[in-house]
Amino acid sequence: MGRDTIAEIITSIRNADMDRKRVVRIASTNITENIIQILLREGFIENVRKHRENNKYFLVLTLRHRRNRKRPYRNILNLKRISRPGLRIYSNYQRIPRILGGMGIVILSTSRGIMTDREARLEGIGGEILCYIW
């Protein structure tokens, strides 16, 4: 069985966010780098750096948390994997779902690379729906 790297990074970020960890280390692949760049651009994570250890590359993510808060606070409310290895979900650009009326983002894998739902609608292309973030 193969590994689902997208599900692994989503789970790692979600678990670190619930545990209020500041730093997460995930394996670096082309897909994970593209998804993390989208999360960085959209403001869900604070910083990314590439780290090499024993000829393997890792991405070290710094999550964005509010400091000095008495009550529990989570920045990333929810991440959900949609298309998975056993059930691929595709959509054309007109039927890409809007998450929370446009407040959340949908990450798609298109013929022009991995992009958000807004970018795909602007370019008029659809693709495989990888995950929802809201």
From Swiss-Prot:
Domain of life: Eukaryota
GO MF terms, alphabetically ordered: rRNA binding; structural constituent of ribosome
Major subcellular location class: plastid
Location(s), subcellular: Plastid, Chloroplast
Keywords assigned: Chloroplast, Plastid, Ribonucleoprotein, Ribosomal protein, RNA-binding, rRNA-binding
SUPFAM superfamilies in the record: Ribosomal protein S8 (SSF56047)
Any GO BP annotation: translation
Gene3D superfamilies listed in its UniProt record: 3.30.1370.30, 3.30.1490.10
A cellular component annotation (GO) from this entry: chloroplast
Annotated signal peptide: none
Record has Plastid as a keyword: yes
Subunit record text: Part of the 30S ribosomal subunit.
Family membership noted in the UniProt record: Belongs to the universal ribosomal protein uS8 family.
Role this protein plays: One of the primary rRNA binding proteins, it binds directly to 16S rRNA central domain where it helps coordinate assembly of the platform of the 30S subunit.
Protein name: Small ribosomal subunit protein uS8c
Naturally occurring in which organism (per UniProt): Solanum bulbocastanum
Gene: rps8
